[in-house]
């Protein structure tokens, strides 16, 4: 069979191309997993395996990176790591080169927020050219919020002060909790189906990242994007930026600011300026996000060409050989220890003292057995004697007397069996159960 020379790979070439393919396609990723096989050799690098219930992947975190970790990793610990997929060419294994590590849960929401923001930005949901202008003459405002929260009270207060003619329709919904995001989507869809308002104000008061998390939902982002009614997002405080703020047609820093944005007053120019500033801020944020993505892509390409990676690979190979040598030495030492224990056991089994101990145990056993046999024999004899005594007692005259019978004896002690055994004038003794009676024969019949 002929093989074209151009199609024949060497192992090194194959591993090199696999490395370029994996590193070029996947880039930087986040991974949530459990640590196992953690090792920290003298080089300062860390080697570990990250796993879940079904799979595992080898990982390396070099000294320059792990010095920034604020805790000591341990086997069984759940962590969140960021890194790049790479191929360790000498062994043909693919691995994750870890750049940063956090305990699982710490920063996880922030990481999910950033990941979703990048995804939706790539899908075009934040694009400025998709934003709609607000109606020039707003008569009805639909407010999507909790009917009992502070946000709706602030909104109604601002509208009453600035323009009491504006009608407010509340689409009540929970703004916090497990099902809040779905409820908010349902309220927006309801408003779109009724077509009774000019603009929607999706809002709630301030809170922690967890409290505002319903407004970082991917489903809600698409619902806002697909809304046929212009949407203003006013979630939290000035410093809070949620996914809904990026997707909405306009963002207000607070619920009160949202109400001011949608109502007219004497200073209409200020309202327009606020709108323009909000759009400018969104455009600047989109520009920053785009440049951040470009910077990360450049950093990734630079890492692939960095000679430091080659040095790290050699250091990793050295560390692995050192670990294998330590394991081999421990295995050999364990084998010698077992052999020594086996020889000691065999020597102890051949010792005369051991045989003497065995014979002493045997003698003690036989003595105990003999004593037991003698005791059993004595018990059997006692039982036989008791049985014989019972039999004798059964035929004893005394036993007969106890049943109400009597025995009559002559003066010489002979048993009287017939009247002919007596004469008139003889003295007789009659034995009873509990005594005797003496009588004199006066007549023989």
UniProtKB/Swiss-Prot annotation:
GO biological process terms, semicolon-separated: DNA catabolic process
Domain of life (superkingdom): Bacteria
UniProt GO MF annotations: exodeoxyribonuclease VII activity; nucleic acid binding
One GO cellular component, as annotated: exodeoxyribonuclease VII complex
Database matches in InterPro entries: Exonuc_VII_L, Exonuc_VII_lsu_C, OB-fold_nuc-bd_dom
Predominant place of localization: cytoplasm
Keywords: Cytoplasm, Exonuclease, Hydrolase, Nuclease
EC code(s) of this entry: 3.1.11.6
Subcellular localization, as worded in the UniProt entry: Cytoplasm
Catalytic activity: Exonucleolytic cleavage in either 5'- to 3'- or 3'- to 5'-direction to yield nucleoside 5'-phosphates
Assembly notes: Heterooligomer composed of large and small subunits.
Function: Bidirectionally degrades single-stranded DNA into large acid-insoluble oligonucleotides, which are then degraded further into small acid-soluble oligonucleotides.
HAMAP family xrefs: Exonuc_7_L
Family of this protein: Belongs to the XseA family.
Protein name per Swiss-Prot or TrEMBL: Exodeoxyribonuclease 7 large subunit
Lineage of the organism: Bacteria, Pseudomonadati, Pseudomonadota, Gammaproteobacteria, Alteromonadales
């Amino acid at each position: 069979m002929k093989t074209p020379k151009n199609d024949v790979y060497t192992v090194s070439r194959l591993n090199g191309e696999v490395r370029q393919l994996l590193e070029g396609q996947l880039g930087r990723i986040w991974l949530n997993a459990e640590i196992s096989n953690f090792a920290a050799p003298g080089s300062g690098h860390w080697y570990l395996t990250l796993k879940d219930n079904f799979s595992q992947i080898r990982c390396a975190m070099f000294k320059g990176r792990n010095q920034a970790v604020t805790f000591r990793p341990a086997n069984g610990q759940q962590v969140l790591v960021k890194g790049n997929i790479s191929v360790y060419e000498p062994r043909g294994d693919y691995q994750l080169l870890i750049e940063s590590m956090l305990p699982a849960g710490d920063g996880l929401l922030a990481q999910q927020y950033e990941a979703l923001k990048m995804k939706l930005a790539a899908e075009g949901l934040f694009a400025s050219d998709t934003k709609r202008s607000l109606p020039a003459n707003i008569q009805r405002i639909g407010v999507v919020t909790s009917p009992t929260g502070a946000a709706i009270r602030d909104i109604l207060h601002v509208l009453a002060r600035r323009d009491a003619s504006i009608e407010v329709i509340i689409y009540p919904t929970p703004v916090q909790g497990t099902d809040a995001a779905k409820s908010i989507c349902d309220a927006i869809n309801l408003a779109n189906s009724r077509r009774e308002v000019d603009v929607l104000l999706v809002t709630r008061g301030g809170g922690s990242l967890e409290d505002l998390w319903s407004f970082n939902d991917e489903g809600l982002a698409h619902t806002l994007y697909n809304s046929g009614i212009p949407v203003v997002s006013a979630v939290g405080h000035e410093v809070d930026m949620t996914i809904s703020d990026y997707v909405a047609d306009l963002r207000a820093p607070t619920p009160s600011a949202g109400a001011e944005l949608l109502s007219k007053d004497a200073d209409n120019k200020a309202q327009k300026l606020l709108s323009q500033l909000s759009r400018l801020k969104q455009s600047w944020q989109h520009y920053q996000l785009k440049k951040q993505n470009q910077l990360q892509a450049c950093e990734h390409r630079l890492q692939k060409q960095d000679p430091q990676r080659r040095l790290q690979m050699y250091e990793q190979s050295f560390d692995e050989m050192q670990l294998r040598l330590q394991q081999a030495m421990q295995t050999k030492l364990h084998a010698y220890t077992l052999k020594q224990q086996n020889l000691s056991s065999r020597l102890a089994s051949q010792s005369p003292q051991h045989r003497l101990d065995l014979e002493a145990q045997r003698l003690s056993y036989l003595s105990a057995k003999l004593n037991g046999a003698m005791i059993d024999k004595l018990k059997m004899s006692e039982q036989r004697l008791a049985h014989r005594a019972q039999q004798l007692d059964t035929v004893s005259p005394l036993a007969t007397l106890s049943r109400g019978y009597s025995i009559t004896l002559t003066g010489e002690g002979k048993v009287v069996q017939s009247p002919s055994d007596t004469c008139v004038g003889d003295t007789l003794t009659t034995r009873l159960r509990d005594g005797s009676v003496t009588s004199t024969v006066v007549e023989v019949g």
